[in-house]
């Protein structure tokens, strides 16, 4: 006899059960063939099984039962290889309220002495048992923690009950109810469905490693700067309502500076001091909260005044940017009273803590990655900058007055160059770029650089987790292995005749037909085609500002325009 099913029912996020007023029993779903068409998941309500309900109640006759049983056997082993997942024994200790340092030492040899005390503090701060006996994750919106031994049943049953729902939709639905259902678990479980995995190839059972999206970058090669209000209008020390966050892509090392307002007279000195104190001026700067015109004007002012060469990068990592903002807001608001009274406390609980905690993406501390002693690192960095500038289209380079400073914009050439391996050039020093002339360049950028939900978990989850657990985590990291220095690496010479670098250069005739349909909502830096200039007008921003000054209407302390709303 089959168990009751719930159709056309909305579920509560807290209790994960259907409302009693609309609960009804329905007949078992008829077996569907693999080739039968099904309605879109957006046009139907999804069904959630109860915790502990077996998936076998919903197995159709055409499915490979042996493959399903194999997944049931191997999933507990797979879960033990994941980070931020409770083991079944620890889950039972939390649920029965018998979690102590002694019980932790009894269930595992790795919890001994101080390690057991530290683990106990972390578990007590994050997990608790509600009045109904459910274990909840206090750092993940108080969502229910699915019991480890029922994870496979929960995912597979939901997959089968909802007509083989899979991928991001399945993860989004289950993660809205349970705190521990990750993308890795979804990908692992759904491969044991013979309808979705017709070839029957199963990933080897080994430790799951999350990909490092920026492992090809050098430290300080690419940064992003964001301006936001950490306390929704409340001023730190009664003076600073805003903060400026700067974070390195490769190492996730972050800097935090106070801001009185978002006017140019306050923002430009802060950004200038940041750039001038860097050991290396970054090759590319990006932002998701600053309007692209404002970002250009800020960098233009700094480059012209101090003779720096600054590159403005593609908007390719909005989720990475947002994750850094959210983790800082989370950390500072956890100590809101102290941080509002003392700016030093903001640094202590924000960048000071995160820069010294092990990062799940890089597997090391940000400070270790940033300050790692790599042979020839400085030479590689400067060589890469020169190669990027030499391969940038002349229309995307703007020389400052006097020839001291330079602004260059990332395009198809430099994007490929920044992400290439060390040996991607031939013996003649000519860059092989398969993206030249590619009309779908924006799509290729998203495939290579975008942080999709499938292959990357939000940086906010990493840093928020590290901020609590890492505070009591002993330093067990090993020194970084130093790669051999490539003494044969040469600088690429310019292969073409350089055109005059002027911001007002008119495009070629073939470029005048390019589309001007860029989104007006997204104000971040985004170059969608090689021929597309940073501005869609032929007038450079410096020219526009000079005209405003001549008319007497130029306000150098104006507020910023459209910013991304968090």
Swiss-Prot record:
Predominant cellular place of this UniProt entry's protein: nucleus
Region annotated Disordered, chain positions: 1-44, 466-566
UniProt KW keywords: DNA recombination, DNA replication, DNA-binding, Metal-binding, Nucleus, Zinc, Zinc-finger
Keyword Transferase: no
Species, as recorded: Saccharomyces cerevisiae (strain ATCC 204508 / S288c)
Single GO biological process annotation from the record: negative regulation of DNA replication
Protein name per the record: DNA replication fork-blocking protein FOB1
GO cellular component term of the entry, any: rDNA heterochromatin
Keyword Nucleus: yes
Gene field: FOB1
Classification of source organism: Eukaryota, Fungi, Dikarya, Ascomycota, Saccharomycotina
Note: Present with 1510 molecules/cell in log phase SD medium.
């Amino acid at each position: 006899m089959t168990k009751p099913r719930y159709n056309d029912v909305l579920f509560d996020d807290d209790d994960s059960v259907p409302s009693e007023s609309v609960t009804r029993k329905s007949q078992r779903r008829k077996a569907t063939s693999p080739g039968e068409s099904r309605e879109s998941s957006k046009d139907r309500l999804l069904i959630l099984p109860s915790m502990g309900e077996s998936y076998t109640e919903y197995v159709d006759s055409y499915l490979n039962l042996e493959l399903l049983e194999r997944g049931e056997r191997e999933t507990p082993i797979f879960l033990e290889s994941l980070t931020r997942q409770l083991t079944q024994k620890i889950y039972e200790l939390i649920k029965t309220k018998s979690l102590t340092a002694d019980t932790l030492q009894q269930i595992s040899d790795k919890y001994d002495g101080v390690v057991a005390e530290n683990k106990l503090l972390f578990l007590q701060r994050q997990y608790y048992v509600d009045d109904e006996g459910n274990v909840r994750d206090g750092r993940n919106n108080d969502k229910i923690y699915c019991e480890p031994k029922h994870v496979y049943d929960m995912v597979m049953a939901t997959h089968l009950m909802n007509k083989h729902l899979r991928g991001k939709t399945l993860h989004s639905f289950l993660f809205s109810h349970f705190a521990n259902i990750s993308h890795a678990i979804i990908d692992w479980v759904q491969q044991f469905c013979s309808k979705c995995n017709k070839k029957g190839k199963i990933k080897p059972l080994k430790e799951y490693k999350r990909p490092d999206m920026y492992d090809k970058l050098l430290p300080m090669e690419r940064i992003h700067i964001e301006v936001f209000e950490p306390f929704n209008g409340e001023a730190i020390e009664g003076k600073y309502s805003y903060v400026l966050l700067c974070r390195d892509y490769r190492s996730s090392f972050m800097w935090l500076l106070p801001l009185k307002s978002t006017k140019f007279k306050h923002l430009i000195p802060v950004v200038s001091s940041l750039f001038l104190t860097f050991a290396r001026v970054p090759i590319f700067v990006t932002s998701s909260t600053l309007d692209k015109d404002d970002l250009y004007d800020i960098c233009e002012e700094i480059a012209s005044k101090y003779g720096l060469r600054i590159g403005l990068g593609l908007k390719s990592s909005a989720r990475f940017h947002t994750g850094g903002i959210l983790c800082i807001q989370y950390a500072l608001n956890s100590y809101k009273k102290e941080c509002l009274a003392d700016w030093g406390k903001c640094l202590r609980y924000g960048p000071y803590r995160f820069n010294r905690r092990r990062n799940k993406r890089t597997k090391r501390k940000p400070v270790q990655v940033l300050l790692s002693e790599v042979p020839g690192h400085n030479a590689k960095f400067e060589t890469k900058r020169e190669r990027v500038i030499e391969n940038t289209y002349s229309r995307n380079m703007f020389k400052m007055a006097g020839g001291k400073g330079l602004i260059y914009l990332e395009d198809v050439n430099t994007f490929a160059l920044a992400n290439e391996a060390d040996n991607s050039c031939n013996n003649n020093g000519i860059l092989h770029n398969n993206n030249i002339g590619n009309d779908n360049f924006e799509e290729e950028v998203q495939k290579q650089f975008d942080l999709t939900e499938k292959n990357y978990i939000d940086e906010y989850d990493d840093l928020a987790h590290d901020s609590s657990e890492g505070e009591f985590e002993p330093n067990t990291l090993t020194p970084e292995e130093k790669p051999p220095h490539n003494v044969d690496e040469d600088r690429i010479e310019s292969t073409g005749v350089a055109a005059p670098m002027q911001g007002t250069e008119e495009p070629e005739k073939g470029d005048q037909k390019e589309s001007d349909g860029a989104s007006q909502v997204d104000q971040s830096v985004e170059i969608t085609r090689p021929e597309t200039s940073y501005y869609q007008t032929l007038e450079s921003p410096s020219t526009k500002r000079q005209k405003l000054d001549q008319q007497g209407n130029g306000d150098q302390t104006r507020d910023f325009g459209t910013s991304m709303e968090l």
